[in-house]
Amino acid sequence: RNIRSRGGGPGQFNYFQQIDVNEDTGLIFMLTTSGKINVYEMETGKFLYDIKIPDKETAQFAMLNDTLVATFMLNSSGQQKERIYISSQKENILNTFYRSDLFEVKSGTRWLMMSGIDRYMFRYKDLICYKEFYNDTLFVVTEKELQPRYIFDLGKYSIPIDCRMEACDGDWKTYNTIAAPYIRNQVIETDSLLFMPYNYWAGEKQRERHMVLYDKKAKE
């Protein structure tokens, strides 16, 4: 089936950033580059309605229900205090969750490290889960709060703030050296296991891909 078409009319889009799906209600949510989320019927591809999101630089999103949106913001400037907005179909911001790991970039330039496989939000059953690469905690996102679900203690492999690419202010040579000992991990949850793919931030081992499995029942 086709999901609408390119263009500027209702339900159309030029480009899209991400898709979310609610299999229970049979809806597809498409984050477009026009600041809207287009909603389509999964079975037919029919356009139903759109949802305006806050006029912010949204990196990713997840639907808490069919009209309530959680949008995630990257901290490319070092001073992006807001990390997640909860908003309604009419663009009203209902809640904001803040970050505390702020830093200064001397030049004032905004730097961004992001790839197409990065995933900050995912679904597990009826939960919306969220984890940043720079954060050791996986949260469950609700309208009212971020609920800690898992804490991943990376110990000596957790990257310090001043070793982040954004904090190095474009000095790739320095970054490639000081960030090399640290790892970044993602999380995928199933009923029995946590899958944690990881790789090093920089250096010779950056392209190597590793995987850790955690047995939820055995707790090991």
Where are these predicted regions, by residue range?
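N-terminal regulatory/sensing modules of transcriptional regulators
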Residues: 45, 62-63, 68-69, 89, ...
